Amino acid sequence: CRYQQYFAVKAMLERIKQDKKGGVVWHTQGSGKSITMVYITKKIMEDKEIQNPQVVIATDRVDLDKQIHKTFNRIGVEAARATTGNNLTELIKNEKIRVITTVVNKFETVVKSGVTVDAPNTFILVDEGHRTQYGEINRRMQEVFKGAIYISFTGTPIMKKDKNIFDKFGGLIHKYSLDDALKDKAIVCLLY
């Protein structure tokens, strides 16, 4: 993994183990947020202090969900992909399923089913959380996963008075800016 991924995972693990709270990983586009999600999931699963963890990776688009699901499985972290709201409900209820990828709109069906999870070691990794976590979708997720630790991954955080991603998720965990990525030559400018 790249250094920003290593330090982000280290900071996330410290935050969830010491403070029992989530926050925001602000890494610019193209810097490997999906792989960072895989690594933090792997660390959570391997940590002996975190008993019976379950990790849910929530995206806002089907193509992102498919991509993240493939990335997890390709790297060797077995993830189940929720194909429908009813399927998500069944995956959540199945205690043998440790990692789930899903699209956020499927939580409406889970809420209607009445299924809730109040386990202390449930982690929700929200891809591009600035797009979906200020209204009904977030309310549904919170209703299903009552005591979960939420971590948002974003390249473009919202910091308005009424919509502030850092207030919503519990502060900044790690930042890797566009300038950092350009300096490292991890990304390049497009001129047109």
Regions found by a protein language model. Name each.
Residues 1-192:
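RecA-like P-loop NTPase motor core of helicase/translocase proteins
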